[in-house]
From Swiss-Prot:
PANTHER family assigned: TRIGGER FACTOR CHAPERONE AND PEPTIDYL-PROLYL CIS/TRANS ISOMERASE, TRIGGER FACTOR-LIKE PROTEIN TIG, CHLOROPLASTIC
Disulphide bridges: none
Keywords: Cell cycle, Cell division, Chaperone, Cytoplasm, Isomerase, Rotamase
Subcellular location: Cytoplasm
Enzyme class: isomerase
UniProt keyword Cell cycle, yes or no: yes
Organism encoding this protein: Desulfitobacterium hafniense (strain Y51)
A single GO cellular-component term on record: cytoplasm
Function: Involved in protein export. Acts as a chaperone by maintaining the newly synthesized protein in an open conformation. Functions as a peptidyl-prolyl cis-trans isomerase.
Domain PPIase FKBP-type: 164-247
UniProt EC number: 5.2.1.8
Record's protein name: Trigger factor 2
Molecular functions (GO terms): peptidyl-prolyl cis-trans isomerase activity; protein folding chaperone; ribosome binding
Catalysed conversion reaction: [protein]-peptidylproline (omega=180) = [protein]-peptidylproline (omega=0)
Length: 434
């Protein structure tokens, strides 16, 4: 085997290596023996067709790909080790034309651990915004959300729908001769402020099992001009009518939902939680400002393949959270009025920045020689266990390989703490100068 490094650019290594033909020939024979039972050719019993006959019938390259798969991981690993490359991620591999008896020529490119050049770590200036003051209306809003979350639902089997009820329907829609995909299990809230689809107001009096034909003239100022003023025809099947009962905000509600004795105590607890959340948001803004300035002072180039992997992981995680709450990414983007392309660009930027932070902090860890004591690691494991709803008892043993993640995170916290301690932080006093 020969391996030659062509270049390392933008944290991606490009290199060539060779594979001895005998290694490939042995893999071809193994592949043939494994697969010959699957081939049947006239004049031979199934499973006993000679390799030369199979190759003449199905082409000389019939076993090439599987044979390459059989040897490539090990041969690639040897090449990487001989070049002393610190690789991350999966490689792109291209095998040259294969000639019998000649060693195989392979081209490979793979992300490598980015080189980080640290700049001045001390003296990063940030303005610390003030935490937003929690007002009574903020507490009221939380209580309203808790009221709705803890609502009492009664199935109205035969009673007609009234204002305040939720009606579950399936519906078809036709507009200007175009039929749209049927919608299943749409929940319509019969209330003056909710007329999302345009037919909710006409569901009053409907009962389970009713099939309604509803026409709705779309407003002339509809955001989609091509359908403004046109008539939408809905065929609606009522599947369920439910009465929603909102519990009063009294001491009984506080005891049931807040696990405290009085509503006064509950409001105080909510205020405390809101203040903590506001302080955390300010802290996050401060940390992001420090990282943003750090990126300007340090040099690191993240491979696009790594950014793609991180961005896809972030998208999958976010989509999973939405689905767990009964939503979808498309619906979320509609609600926040954002285009898919713009959202994905933001995710890409977030992924790139998170990777930059990871590698810069890793470099600081090495430069400063940060370590984690046994006591710190045990406490970190207990804290991490609680964060994933695991008992903290014997957390270090239970977490297994995740202990390495905990240890690394603790070192990264120390690295960031160094930046924080040596930053120049000014409080935003709210003054505006012309």
């Amino acid at each position: 085997m020969n391996a030659v490094l062509e270049n390392i650019e933008n944290s991606e290594a490009r290199f060539r290596f060779t594979i001895d033909y005998k290694v490939f020939a042995d893999a071809l024979e193994k592949t043939y023996r494994k697969n010959k039972k699957n081939y049947q050719v006239a004049g031979f019993r199934k499973g006993n067709v000679p390799r030369s006959v199979i190759e003449s019938q199905y082409g000389p390259t019939v076993f090439y790909q599987e044979a390459l798969d059989l040897i490539m991981t090990e041969e690639y690993k040897k090449a990487v080790e001989s070049l002393a490359l610190n690789t991350i991620g999966d490689p792109d591999i291209e095998v040259g034309e294969i000639e019998k008896g000649q060693e195989l020529s392979v081209k490979a490119s793979v992300p490598v651990v980015p080189e980080v050049t640290l700049g001045q770590l001390e003296g990063i200036e940030v303005v610390m915004p003030k935490a937003r003051e929690v007002k009574e209306r903020d507490i009221d809003k939380v209580l309203e959300e808790l009221q709705y979350k803890n609502k009492k639902i009664t199935d109205k089997e035969i009673a007609p729908a009234e204002k305040g009820d939720t009606v579950t329907v399936d519906y078809d829609c036709e507009l200007d001769g175009t039929k749209f995909e049927p919608v299943v299990d749409y929940k319509a809230l019969l209330d003056d402020s909710s007329d999302t689809m345009g037919f909710e107001g006409q569901l009053e009096g409907a009962q389970k099992g009713d099939i309604l034909d509803i026409k709705k003239v779309l407003p002339h100022d509809h955001p989609q001009p091509q359908i403004a003023g046109k008539t939408a025809c809905f065929k609606v099947t009522v599947k369920k009518v439910e009465r929603i009962e909102i519990l009063p905000l009294d001491d009984a509600f506080a005891q049931k939902v807040g696990n405290v004795s009085t509503m006064e105590e509950f409001r105080a607890e909510i205020k405390k939680n809101l203040e903590q959340a506001a302080a955390q948001r300010v802290q996050m803004q401060r940390n992001n400002a420090i990282l943003s300035e750090l990126f300007k002072r340090c040099q690191v180039k993240i491979p696009e393949s790594l950014i793609m992997q991180r961005a896809m992981s972030m998208l999958e995680q976010f989509s999973g959270q939405l689905e767990a709450e009964g939503g979808t990414l498309d619906l979320y983007l509609q609600l926040i009025n954002k285009k898919s392309g713009d959202f994905k660009r933001e995710v890409w930027e977030d992924a790139e920045n998170s990777l930059k932070a990871d590698y810069i902090l890793d470099k600081i860890i090495k430069e400063k020689g940060y370590t984690v004591s046994e006591e710190e690691l045990n406490q970190g494991c207990e804290k991490f266990a609680l964060s994933i709803n695991m008992s903290p008892e014997n957390a270090r043993q239970k977490l297994g390989p995740l202990v390495h993640k905990v240890e690394h995170d603790l070192k990264a916290e120390k690295a960031f703490q160094y930046l924080l301690e040596h930053a120049v932080i000014r409080e935003d006093n709210g003054d505006k100068t012309a």
